[in-house]
Every structure is written in C-alpha cells, then in structure tokens.
Curated annotation (Swiss-Prot):
Higher taxonomy: Bacteria, Pseudomonadati, Pseudomonadota, Gammaproteobacteria, Pasteurellales
NCBIfam families attached to this UniProt entry: PRK05337.1
Record protein name field: Beta-hexosaminidase
Pathway where this protein functions: Cell wall biogenesis; peptidoglycan recycling
EC id: 3.2.1.52
Function field: Plays a role in peptidoglycan recycling by cleaving the terminal beta-1,4-linked N-acetylglucosamine (GlcNAc) from peptide-linked peptidoglycan fragments, giving rise to free GlcNAc, anhydro-N-acetylmuramic acid and anhydro-N-acetylmuramic acid-linked peptides.
Length: 345
C-alpha cells in the first residue's frame, strides 16, 4: 500500500522494522541513498535480505535532470532532446527506444524493480516538467514516448505514465504548492490527456501516476485525490486496469488534502492502489499508526505485477555490443542537449 524512503546509504534496524510493517509495500531510492554502484548494489542486497517480505524497489531514473544515480551509470538524455536534436522522426524514436531499454537494463542489473517513467506531460510552461517532457504537441511526442516505453517493455520493466491528466500547463511546482489549472475541460481532454488515452488503449502502461493539480473546471480535488479523475475518467472512460500510484503525498501540492493520514485516506478512496510518502519520516509513522485499511486482492495482484521478472548481470550487460553502442550514443546526445540548452536558454 505504502512506498516510503530511507534516510541514508545504509539501512538502519529501525528502517527494517518500518519496512516490515504490513502496510508498507516498497520503497523509493533518492540521490542521498547513492554514492557509487558498489555501495548501491550492497544497499539493495541488504534491503532484499534483511526485510522478510518482497518489496517493490523503485527510483526516478527518467534521464536528464531527473536521474538519481549518475556516477557509474549512463548519462541519460532529457526526453525533450529526442525531438529537438534528432535529424528525423525515425532517429528520434530509435534513440528513445534505446534509452528506455538501457535505463531498464541498468536498473535491473542493480536489482531495482521500477523506474517511474515516462513523463507524458505536454511541455507547455511548467518549470517542474520542462525538458522532462517529450514535447508540446501530442501527435509529435506520442511516437517518441511510445518508443521509450517499448524499450522498457522489451527489457521487461513495468511502465508508469505520469502525471495524469497532464501537469505541463501550470506554472506552479506541486513540490512546493498546489497548482490550479483553470482551462476548460475540453482543452485538457483534447490535448493533455491524449498521450495517456492512446497508450492505455494499446495496453502499454502498467501504471499511472496522477498529478497533485486541481483542474478547477472538472473537480475541486487534486487529481491524485479525485474520484472523478481516477474512477470516472481513468478507470471507467479510459478502461485503465493497471496500478494507480499517488504522487508523493509528502509534497506541498498534496497539502490541500489535509494531514498525512487524511491525504492517504483520500488518495485510497479516490482510487489509488499504492501511495508514495517521501521525506516525511514522522508522517510515515502517523500513517502506519492511523490508517485503517486492508489492501484488496486486486490491489495486491497489481502490486506484484510490477516486480522485476528478469535477472541482468552488470558485467554481462557492459560486455554486450548493444549496450556499449547505446551508451556511447546516448551520452553524446545528452552532452549535445546540454550544449543546446546553454545556447538557447
């Protein structure tokens, strides 16, 4: 039910006990948990061995500026680089697929189940999204996003489309405050929601993460706590049958929904299967003590479906020609993107 974080680069006994709580289903790793590849491998091994139940181990390893593990890992390009720098659509989709495959392979080689990717927000004006987006035009960005997803799926990693129904149009950063999107309902349904709709119809999204954004012309609650968005639209209209993650309930944007227990209750009632709660250790304890909820059989099955099902050895991955070629190409692309941004921003 709950995905939480840990404080440092080693697992404490107190954290082991918290992770073994019946309501905890997994954890998310951050840059503070990472020093180098050897340390990360030891940390994940410690988690797997010391916690006496299967845990979903996750990370945000999107690429560009949102890449928690860097030293010893491929410098993944920002998603906007594919459309902007590729010579033609065929090259952009090929690069995107390579990136999805390589990212998933590197995570599996460290025994990490899932990277929360890809971002499907249209790149309007939100600084929190920015070059994390594949582009502004849904028709142009969809093939690139789909190619990235196909690369992840080829490796066997579950995919997470975020931030439903679209975070890209608001100026406010939901890490810091609750954003409000005042556009008419038609504007959201005719543009922002299209990448989610198309990829759901093709069965290519294992999970969805809704936004901590209030779409004022549609509902009074943030999408992450909205029955309208999660049950009526996502489940009933779009027929999505996968996992619904809440975005981090520790973010300021979730504060609109009350204290940590109230946020969790509202997210569950709205339709979330798994809840992220990060950087709030006291909040985690409050939820574990105060949340009265037993996950359903369907929610448990959805959770298990996200677990890694393929073993990848790092030395074998590094030795493969496909990996070597992809790493060289994608590192060069990210360097080109940084140079491009320096000249145009």
């Amino acid at each position: 039910m709950l995905l939480i974080d840990i404080k440092d680069k080693e697992l404490s006994q107190e954290e082991v006990e918290i992770l073994e709580h019946p309501l905890v289903s997994g954890l998310i790793l951050f840059s503070r948990n990472f020093h180098d590849k050897v340390q990360l491998e030891a940390l994940v091994k410690s988690i797997r061995q010391r916690v006496k139940k299967p845990l979903l181990i996750t990370v945000d390893q999107e690429g560009g500026r949102v890449q928690r593990f860097r030293e010893g890992f491929t410098k993944l390009p920002a998603m906007q680089a594919f459309h902007t720098l590729a010579k033609n659509p065929q090259e952009s989709t090929a690069l995107a697929r390579q990136t999805g495959w390589l990212m998933a392979a590197e995570m599996f080689a460290l025994d990490i189940d899932l990277s929360f990717a890809p971002v499907l927000d249209l790149g309007h004006q939100c600084k929190a999204i920015g070059d994390r987006s594949f582009g502004e035009n849904p028709d142009a960005m969809l093939p690139i996003a789909e190619a990235f997803i196909d690369g992840m799926r080829e490796m066997g990693m579950a995919t997470t489309g975020k931030h439903f129904p679209g975070h890209g149009h608001v100026l406010a950063d939901s890490h810091l405050e609750t954003p409000f999107d005042d556009r008419p309902k038609e504007a959201i349904f005719n543009r922002d929601i299209l990448p989610f709709k198309q990829l759901i119809s093709k069965g290519k999204l294992s999970a969805i993460m809704p936004a901590h954004v209030i779409y004022t012309q549609c509902d009074s609650q943030p999408a992450s706590g909205s029955e309208y968005w999660l049950k009526q639209v996502l489940r009933n209209q779009l027929n999505f049958n996968g996992v619904i993650f809440s975005d981090d309930l520790g973010m300021k944007g979730a504060g609109f929904m009350g204290n940590f227990v109230e946020r969790s209750e509202k997210a569950i009632h709205a339709g979330c299967d798994l809840l992220l709660l990060c950087n709030e250790p006291e909040g985690v304890i409050q939820v574990l003590d105060g949340l009265k909820y037993q996950p359903t059989k369907t929610q448990t099955e959805r959770h298990i479906s996200l677990m890694k099902r393929k073993t990848v050895r790092w030395n074998e991955l590094e030795a493969s020609p496909r990996y070597q070629q992809a790493q060289q190409r994608l590192t060069a692309l990210q360097n080109d993107w940084l140079e491009y941004k320096a000249q145009h921003c």
